[in-house]
Amino acid sequence: MPYQAPVSEYQFIFDKVVPLAQVVEKERFSEAAPDITDAVLKECGKMCESVMAPLQRPGDLHPAYLENGVVRTPPGFAEGYAAIAESGWIGISAGTQYGGMDLPFALNAAMHDLMCGACISLNLCPLLSQGQIEALEHHASDELQKLYLPKLISGQWTGTMNLTEPHAGSDVGALTTKAEPQGDKTYKTVSYTHLTLPTML
């Protein structure tokens, strides 16, 4: 059975369970009127069904691999990621100053749920970028925000997940990476660290 995005369920949730109407009363989210919310959910749902879901099985059958020092993604993943980026979904909750839509994070969470249901392996890329965008918006200097946010929000650059070492796997407690202060700098002793989704384009 083909994937069907649960758009109507989220419309119900945002109307009856967690009313976005209360959020829209805030000046920051005044643009997130119900018609905008519905349009975002419907358009994201269409993309999930037509672009992302068809990539789930090919991604399982033809996983990423290393070829001559270059990681090759499953067939269609680069095009799928480009469709996500071109639709503006990566910056849905990011500030408008650097190209985001500045819509409520609840809508962002719903969108990522739809996208994960369609093809979680592809959606990890914009989902990881969302984490970096949020961290930069809240904690980075203006200079760093100007450098990174436009490229992350547009999808030109992607966020990564840097969690493990070859001997540790999912046992984060077995990591041996250390950072020790060396005067004004930090010196790291590390074995190879695995990166998740460093680039899709």
Predicted regions and their residues:
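Flexible, glycine/threonine-enriched loop-and-boundary segments that flank and lead into catalytic domains
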Residues: 70-82, 93, 162-181, 195
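Conserved small/polar residues in nucleotide/adenosyl-binding loops
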Residues: 193-199
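Short, intrinsically disordered, charge-balanced linker/junction segments flanking boundaries
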Residues: 185-189, 201
